[in-house]
C-alpha cells in the first residue's frame, strides 16, 4: 500500500488512516492532514460530514497546527458507549472531563490539545482503546507494555493482537477496493 500524498483532506487520506472506523470495527481514528487553505479545508470537512453523518460517522478537526490539522473521525454512538464504561468514566473524571456528555468530552479534549502543555493520553479512549491499556499507558509513562501495535497493550494481549490484525487487514482491503473504483460512500458501513 503506497502512502497518500495530498495537501487537503481527501477520500484517499481518510481511507488510508480511518478504514477500521469506516468499517465499524473501531470507535475512532486520528490523522494529520496537510492544509494549505483553511477555508477550503473546512468546506471539505462540511461536505464529507454531509455524506458521513447519515451513516453514523462524523469527522472533526481537533487541532490546527499551521500547515496541518489533527483530524478525528469517529462514530458518535460507539463513542458514547465507550465513554459510558465505568473504567473510562473514571479515567476521564480524574482529569475533570464532563463525563455526562460525550460531545462536551470532545470539546474538553480539543481544549487540552490546544492548550498544549501535555499531550492528553486519555485520547486513546476516544479511539476505542481498552480503558485498562489507556490507564496502563498513563500510569506507566508509556513504559512496560506487554505488546505494541496500534496502541501499547497493558491488558489482554491476545485480544489486542487480534484487533491489530483485523485493523491492518481492513485497511488493506479498503485501500484495494478504493483503488478498484469502489465508491468512498459505499465503504462507510452504517452501524446500528
Task: Report the location of each language-model feature.
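Intrinsic low-complexity, intrinsically disordered or marginally ordered coil/linker segments
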Residues: 1, 20, 93, 106, ...
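Short, extreme N-terminal leader segments that mark the start of a protein/domain
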Residues: 1-34
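Short, flexible, solvent-exposed loop/turn segments with mixed acidic/basic and small polar residues
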Residues: 18-24, 59-63, 110-115
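Metallocofactor- and cofactor-centric catalytic cores in central/energy metabolism, strongly enriched
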Residues: 39
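A glycine-rich, hydrophobic loop/mini-helix early in the fold
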Residues: 43-101
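Internal catalytic-core helix/loop-beta-alpha segment
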Residues: 94-121
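Hydrophobic/aromatic-rich, well-ordered segments within soluble, folded domains that form packed cores
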Residues: 119-146
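Long, compositionally biased
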Residues: 150-192
Amino acid at each position: 500500500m503506497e502512502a497518500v500524498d495530498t495537501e487537503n483532506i481527501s477520500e484517499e487520506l481518510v481511507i488510508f488512516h480511518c478504514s477500521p472506523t469506516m468499517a465499524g470495527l473501531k470507535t475512532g481514528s486520528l490523522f494529520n492532514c496537510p492544509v494549505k487553505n483553511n477555508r477550503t479545508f473546512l468546506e471539505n470537512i462540511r461536505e464529507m460530514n454531509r455524506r458521513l453523518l447519515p451513516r453514523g460517522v462524523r469527522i472533526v478537526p481537533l487541532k490546527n497546527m499551521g500547515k496541518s490539522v489533527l483530524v478525528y473521525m469517529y462514530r458518535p454512538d460507539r463513542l458514547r458507549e465507550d465513554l459510558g464504561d465505568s473504567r473510562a468514566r473514571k479515567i476521564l473524571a480524574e482529569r475533570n472531563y464532563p463525563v455526562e456528555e460525550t460531545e462536551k468530552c470532545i470539546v474538553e479534549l480539543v481544549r487540552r490539545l490546544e492548550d498544549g502543555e501535555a499531550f492528553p493520553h486519555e485520547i486513546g479512549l476516544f479511539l476505542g482503546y481498552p480503558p485498562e491499556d489507556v490507564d496502563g499507558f498513563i500510569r506507566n509513562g508509556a513504559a512496560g507494555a506487554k505488546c505494541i501495535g496500534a496502541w501499547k497493550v497493558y491488558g489482554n494481549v491476545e485480544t489486542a493482537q487480534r484487533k491489530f490484525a483485523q485493523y491492518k487487514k481492513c485497511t488493506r482491503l479498503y485501500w484495494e477496493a478504493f483503488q478498484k473504483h469502489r465508491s468512498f460512500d459505499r465503504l462507510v458501513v452504517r452501524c446500528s
